[in-house]
């Protein structure tokens, strides 16, 4: 469905000005059956991006604003006694949708975060001994305000590892901001967003991405990159096996969006930092040297030899 992908990209670019590289990465994560962490200051388009995706991809959308008083049952749902029927019935929580916007996830308790964790990993919730599966496709887009903002706390490593990628929207450049201001004088492009692909077509796209071929040389390259993060002197926690699998899945989605049925090293390189950066725990020496995870990962990309792959 190359034409459908192109139309999705065009519509996202029309709604989110000047952020095609970021919206493309988010679209790749959806195609790769992954979850997305958006780390940024308020007001740069995180919520609009999630809403646009849900409308363009025909997904049922829910949003939960994480605050200290949000409890696990708000996320997973709960059982309630029905006096008329004399039975307990399940009342769905926020996760019973196709696309969940988990807003300001680092403002809530660790217990509530853990409730979301099970759903992200397993695609189901357990309430009072009963298991309930979420609809397919299922994607969580979580937003996180910068650590140090009022009321925020660090997400645990186990939670961060569940997100396929982490990206930052950033402020728009000057021309994109002018375009946004001009467009919003007339209408909000989001209000006129129409479905480009149905939920069934999204599932088919995900299946096609899964079938993209990855040569052994590329898998070997991915393994070398992962090992380099674990052996780097400035990194105390490198890329986990789950993270390494996520890297392969994102590389497949990158190849698919470039209309290729096989992965090349450039696909891996293009998504490596988005997959790995939020999973890294840096040594104190890195902080002393004022090096970020992305800067160190760029050095790793430069150091690890790229394999020759026949196209």
State the predicted function of each range.
Residues 82-87, 108, 112, 120-197, ...:
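Canonical AAA+ ATPase core
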Residues 2-44:
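Pre-Walker A (pre-P-loop) alpha-helix and adjacent loop at the N terminus of AAA/AAA+ ATPase modules
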Residues 231-311:
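C-terminal engagement/docking regions of AAA+ P-loop ATPases
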Residues 40, 103-104, 115:
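Walker B catalytic acidic pair
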Residues 175, 182-263, 288:
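AAA+ P-loop NTPase domains with strong preference for DNA replication initiators
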Residues 30-67:
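Walker A/P-loop
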Residues 25-28, 81-101, 130:
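Conserved alpha-helical scaffold flanking the Walker A/P-loop in AAA+ ATPase domains
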Residues 41, 75, 143:
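P-loop (Walker A) phosphate-binding loop of NTP-binding proteins
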């Amino acid at each position: 469905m190359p034409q459908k992908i192109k139309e999705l990209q065009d519509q996202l670019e029309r709604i989110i000005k000047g952020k095609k590289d970021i919206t493309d990465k988010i679209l790749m994560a959806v195609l790769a059956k992954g979850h997305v962490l958006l780390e940024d200051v308020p007001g740069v388009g995180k919520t609009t991006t999630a809403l646009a995706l849900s409308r363009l991809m025909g997904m049922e959308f829910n949003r939960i604003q994480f605050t200290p008083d949000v409890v696990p049952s708000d996320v997973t749902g709960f059982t309630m006694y029905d006096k008329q029927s004399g039975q307990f019935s399940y009342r769905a929580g926020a996760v019973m949708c196709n696309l969940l916007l988990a807003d300001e996830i680092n403002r809530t308790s660790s217990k509530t975060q853990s409730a979301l964790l099970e759903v992200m990993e397993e695609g189901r919730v357990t309430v009072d001994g009963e298991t309930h599966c979420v609809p397919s496709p299922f994607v969580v887009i979580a937003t996180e305000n910068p650590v140090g903002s009022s009321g925020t706390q660090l997400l645990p490593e186990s939670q961060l590892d569940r997100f396929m990628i982490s990206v930052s929207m950033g402020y728009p450049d000057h021309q994109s901001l002018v375009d946004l201001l001009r467009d919003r004088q007339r209408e909000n492009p989001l209000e006129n967003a129409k479905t480009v692909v149905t939920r069934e077509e999204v599932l088919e796209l995900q299946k096609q991405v899964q079938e993209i071929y990855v040569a052994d040389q590329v898998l070997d390259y991915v393994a070398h990159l992962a090992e380099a993060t674990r052996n780097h002197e400035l990194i105390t926690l490198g890329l986990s096996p789950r993270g390494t699998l996520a890297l392969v899945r994102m590389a497949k989605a990158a190849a698919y969006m470039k209309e290729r049925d096989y992965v090349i090293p450039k696909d891996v390189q293009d998504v490596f930092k988005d997959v790995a950066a939020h999973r890294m725990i840096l040594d104190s020496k890195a902080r002393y040297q004022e090096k970020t995870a992305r800067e160190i990962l760029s050095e790793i990309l430069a150091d690890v030899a790229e394999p020759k792959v026949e196209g």
